Amino acid sequence: MFDSIKIALQYITPKHLISRLVGKLAAAKAGGLTTGLIKLFIKQYKVNMAEAERENPADYASFNEFFTRALKDDARVICPNEQDLAMPVDGAVSQLGDIKHDSIFQAKGHDYSLTTLLGGKPELATAFKNGKFATVYLSPKDYHRIHMPMDGQLTDMVYVPGELFSVSPLTAERVPGLFARNERVVAIFDTPKGKMAMVLVGATIVASIETVWAGTVSPPVGKNVVHWQYPSEGEDAVFLKKGDELGRFKLGSTIVACFEPDMVEFADYSAGDDTRLGDVFATLTQ
């Protein structure tokens, strides 16, 4: 009963307004008040600050600085084997498996459209039909930067406006088409073995989504789908190596990774399993 009420409230609350207000508060530099809030957050969510580049909460001028904190260089090891893809985030597996033509599994009783996920762009979705997908949820305690599973040349980025439902496991079970409804940023890469899509999905109180090449993408792009294309050479070209930072969430969310058919086999993960940046995510089949 309580779960049903929580979901119902998400449909009627002004999620965008709340998220933007929280974003402004998280960006505020309020001295001791900011430090106090950070300490409360660390205690509430049991954040491991021993891994952080800056361990002292007082060293962060804003909550956003803390939330997108860097880790120490030796805190994560990127799997070295060239055949292995690196887990792109700390988090927990929501779902992973086969893309069945244009359909991605969300939770029991709920699938959603690959094409819709990628911004309603059939020309981008075609490469991934009957391929593989993995959805990973980042909880509040997690490190919130996203890294590359493998080397890739950026070809396309799509901003897709949408809702800002929570992306918690409960919401994934109850809200149809959740990841294809929420605001998101899609990045398409050419890799040595085929195409890879990395989809950064927004959520309630996610103040912004950033990429290393474009900075803040959301907000304030607007209410229309926006599609950027990138060259393979020149000053606007973007090439990222395995383990490089791709982007970050300010206040947490979910990533969906998609791969071409016959390109990868996932490591032994199941729904609910914890993930750690740099561990073996998948192995190339070619």
UniProtKB/Swiss-Prot annotation:
Q: How is the cofactor bound?
A: Binds 1 pyruvoyl group covalently per subunit.
Q: Name one GO molecular function term.
A: phosphatidylserine decarboxylase activity
**Recorded E.C. number(s)?**
4.1.1.65
One Gene Ontology term, aspect cellular component: plasma membrane
Q: Where is this site: Cleavage (non-hydrolytic)?
A: G252, S253
Compartments, as annotated in UniProt: Cell membrane
List required co-factors. Answer: pyruvate
Pfam families assigned: PS_Dcarbxylase
Which pathway does it operate in? Phospholipid metabolism; phosphatidylethanolamine biosynthesis; phosphatidylethanolamine from CDP-diacylglycerol: step 2/2
Q: How does it assemble?
A: Heterodimer of a large membrane-associated beta subunit and a small pyruvoyl-containing alpha subunit.
What the entry lists under NCBIfam families is as follows: PS_decarb
| Protein name in UniProt | Phosphatidylserine decarboxylase proenzyme
Species the sequence originates in: Pseudoalteromonas atlantica (strain T6c / ATCC BAA-1087)
Its lineage reads:
Bacteria, Pseudomonadati, Pseudomonadota, Gammaproteobacteria, Alteromonadales
